A protein has these predicted regions:
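Loop-helix junctions at membrane interfaces
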Residues: 1-174
Length: 174
């Protein structure tokens, strides 16, 4: 697709959002982050959370006008599915990772950018209660982008191409 004035700003917003997410991640990698309190009394935790929130807003903004407005709500529903399934698996001590199911579903339906927004929204909302989750923002972004790009290439068109990878993924030790 050729870049024109209408699409260039969308790409710029996505790149800036990913850069902000990586900057927030680098802040969590610092040795200082492990010693600070993981509530919002720490400036470092609060600034990481604000950077990730701003990145999520930029991802949503990049899709405004490109998709119907109701589709912009999909990442919020996907994030709620992620948080619900993640808390259920943690409480039931099931050794499976179900906290990215919503991200994968939204990425398949709405594309990689909204899949990335779902992963980032999950991190931002989960970071309110567990600030350690903020360090895993790149994981949600990567999963949303990878699954969305695979869906665009038609990887999920056949049932057999879904069942085998899902069974391998679900049987992975936690």
């Amino acid at each position: 697709m050729a870049l024109n004035r209408d699409t260039t700003w969308r790409y710029v917003l996505v790149v800036v959002a990913v850069a902000l997410s990586l900057a927030a991640w680098f802040c969590t990698v610092l040795g200082v982050y492990s010693t600070v309190t993981v509530n919002f009394e720490s400036y470092l935790t609060a600034s990481v959370w604000v950077l990730l929130l701003l990145a999520a807003v930029l991802l949503y903004t990049s899709q405004y006008g490109l998709v119907p407005n109701c589709i912009l709500l999909y990442p919020i529903f996907g994030a709620s599915v992620n948080l619900l399934l993640g808390s259920l698996t943690v409480r039931s001590l099931v050794p499976l990772f179900f906290d990215t199911v919503g991200t994968s579903i939204v990425a398949i339906i709405a594309g990689p950018v909204l899949g990335m927004a779902t992963g980032l929204t999950t991190t931002v909302l989960g970071g309110v209660y567990f600030a350690y989750d903020l360090a895993f923002a790149p994981v949600g972004i990567f999963i949303g982008a990878a699954v969305g790009l695979m869906a665009r290439r038609g990887v999920f068109n056949r049932l057999s191409s879904i069942i085998f990878p899902a069974s391998v993924w679900a049987s992975a030790p936690a």
